[in-house]
């Protein structure tokens, strides 16, 4: 991938982008094999690769500069503002809207927040695009309600220029610290969620719910999990750390009941709405801590799917899964290092199948799907 920001050494987030993409995949595959299954008899399936540009559906932009010259991007290594509105990770429609927003913020006279002076208002622009419809969800993260009047006054111009913006909200984050968002979300549009489709499965995206940032690869991840689950054909399964329900919505079937557990209520609201749209009766969701949920259960279904955050399952949950003894565990991980640690603690289980998905090109990160069976 040719990236002027990387060449200039002003942005190094994609630290592998100077390597040919095929070489990145080969190296990553070798590294993952050495980490996950160096000496085990495991079925290692070919990786699912990504486009190397224009694959990302979400942008998190720091608002820098001044009201008369706002910049959406990051601070470079020298602490200088760097506009990333033309970042090659974003599809052209996202680049166009981000570039427009820089000028729109200037015209609206909205002062960027200055973390050194602790002055100003606008902290972040969070932009999500539906791969399926091309519609956008735009969130302004601001220090206070003072920004609302200027945003609302200039909103008609923005919507007229980009009618594909479906959801607009202002998130109030008043504290002076490196926190992306606050508790209060103020919607400026009647619509409060974005609709995405993966493999004909509707996925409702609300402002605070986690959603995969590489939709093409995520679609294949969910489809693969569904295939593996249908081979097992459990009558019941759990989806722990289910988020907006991507795995649960794909795996539920007339003869497979799924319970999805996620601590974030907004993500559960999205998952429940998606299930209603699909008309699935044997799919339920609850806003609970996954470890506390499993601790309250006397037994486990035949299959438990887990998709934890980067920190992994942790010793408490791995111990509970050991005790509950489901026959199969399907582990999807964005951090193979913590996954390997968790699997080592699941000593009653044997790894039988692995496939990785290049959700994060030009980095060392990968999404790994692993099937474990009880010995």
Swiss-Prot record:
Residues that span the membrane, as ranges: none
Pfam families: tRNA_U5-meth_tr
Top EC class, one word: transferase
Molecular functions (GO terms): 4 iron, 4 sulfur cluster binding; iron ion binding; rRNA (uridine-C5-)-methyltransferase activity
EC number assigned by the record: 2.1.1.189
GO biological process: rRNA base methylation
Active site residues according to the UniProt entry: 334
Keyword Transcription: no
SUPFAM superfamilies tied to this protein: S-adenosyl-L-methionine-dependent methyltransferases (SSF53335)
Residues the entry annotates as binding [4Fe-4S] cluster: 3, 11, 14, 87
Superkingdom classification of source: Bacteria
Residues the record lists as binding S-adenosyl-L-methionine: 212, 241, 262, 307
UniProt cross-references to PANTHER family, sorted A to Z: RNA M5U METHYLTRANSFERASE (PTHR11061), TRNA (URACIL(54)-C(5))-METHYLTRANSFERASE (PTHR11061:SF30)
Role of this protein: Catalyzes the formation of 5-methyl-uridine at position 747 (m5U747) in 23S rRNA.
Family as reported in the entry's similarity comment: Belongs to the class I-like SAM-binding methyltransferase superfamily. RNA M5U methyltransferase family. RlmC subfamily.
Name of the protein described by the UniProt record: 23S rRNA (uracil(747)-C(5))-methyltransferase RlmC
Organism: Vibrio cholerae serotype O1 (strain ATCC 39315 / El Tor Inaba N16961)
Lineage of producing organism: Bacteria, Pseudomonadati, Pseudomonadota, Gammaproteobacteria, Vibrionales
């Amino acid at each position: 991938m040719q990236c002027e920001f990387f060449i200039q050494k002003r942005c190094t987030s994609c630290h592998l982008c100077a390597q040919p993409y095929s070489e990145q995949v080969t190296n990553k595959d070798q590294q993952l094999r050495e980490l996950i299954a160096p000496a085990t008899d495991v079925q290692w399936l070919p990786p699912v690769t990504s486009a190397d540009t224009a694959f990302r559906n979400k942008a998190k932009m720091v608002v820098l500069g001044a009201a008369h010259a706002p910049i959406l991007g990051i601070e470079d290594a020298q602490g200088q503002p760097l506009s990333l509105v033309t970042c090659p990770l974003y599809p052209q429609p996202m680049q166009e809207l981000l570039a427009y927003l820089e000028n729109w913020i200037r015209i609206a006279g909205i002062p960027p927040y200055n973390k050194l002076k602790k002055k100003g208002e606008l902290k972040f622009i969070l932009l999500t695009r539906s791969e399926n419809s091309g519609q956008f969800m735009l969130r302004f993260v601001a220090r206070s309600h003072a920004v609302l009047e200027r945003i609302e006054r200039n909103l008609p111009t923005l919507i007229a220029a980009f009618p594909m913006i479906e959801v607009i909200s202002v998130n109030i984050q008043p504290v002076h610290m490196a926190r992306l968002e606050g508790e209060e979300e103020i919607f400026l549009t009647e619509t409060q969620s974005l609709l995405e489709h993966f493999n004909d499965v509707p996925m409702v995206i609300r402002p605070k719910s986690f959603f995969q940032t590489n939709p093409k690869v995520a679609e294949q991840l969910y489809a693969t999990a569904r295939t593996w689950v249908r081979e097992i054909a459990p009558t019941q399964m759990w989806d722990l750390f289910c988020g907006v329900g991507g795995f649960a919505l794909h795996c539920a079937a007339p003869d497979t009941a799924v319970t999805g557990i996620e601590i974030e209520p907004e993500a559960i609201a999205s998952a429940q709405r998606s299930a209603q749209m699909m008309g699935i009766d044997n799919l339920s969701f609850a806003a609970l801590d996954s470890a506390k949920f499993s601790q309250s259960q006397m037994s486990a279904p035949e299959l438990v799917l887990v998709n934890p955050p980067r920190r992994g399952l942790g010793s408490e949950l791995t111990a509970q899964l050991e005790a509950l003894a489901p026959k199969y565990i399907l582990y999807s991980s964005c951090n193979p290092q913590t996954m390997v640690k968790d699997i080592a603690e699941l000593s009653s289980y044997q790894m039988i199948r692995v496939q990785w998905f290049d959700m994060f090109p030009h980095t060392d990160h990968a999404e790994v799907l692993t099937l474990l069976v009880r010995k």
